[in-house]
């Protein structure tokens, strides 16, 4: 007898839920378990799922006051735990995250922001300067990052 595969029902079809929140699924691990190894600073920083979940909740509360489900939110941050938390927080409130890259020039940012319908961008001072009025910047330090 063949062994059942995770995610498949008895007939071999995928078990697809009617609703799925990617953020909740991603964060549904032991809070003490390692989620992210941050090597961007002077020293290694380990971020647990519990800490990441707290970061996500803080950002989600701030974003929920500004963005509706289905809204497009740009993320223009460096590669850090806060960048990961930003995407998860956006998904948690049912919005769509649009990854943006600080090495893009203005025209590349403009095409992505406009094509995706981004109106708000979670960023920092460097990112705000790169945006140049393309969308409303939401400064990370104003939401506890």
Ranges and model annotations:
Residues 1-3, 38, 86, 137-140:
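Generic low-polarity alpha-helical segments
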Residues 35-88, 105-110, 114:
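Conserved AMP-binding/adenylate-forming core of the ANL superfamily
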Residues 8-9, 34, 72, 91-95:
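Generic, low-specificity signal for short hydrophobic/alpha-helical stretches with a mild N-terminal bias
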Residues 1-47, 51-61, 126:
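N-lobe entry segment of adenylate-forming
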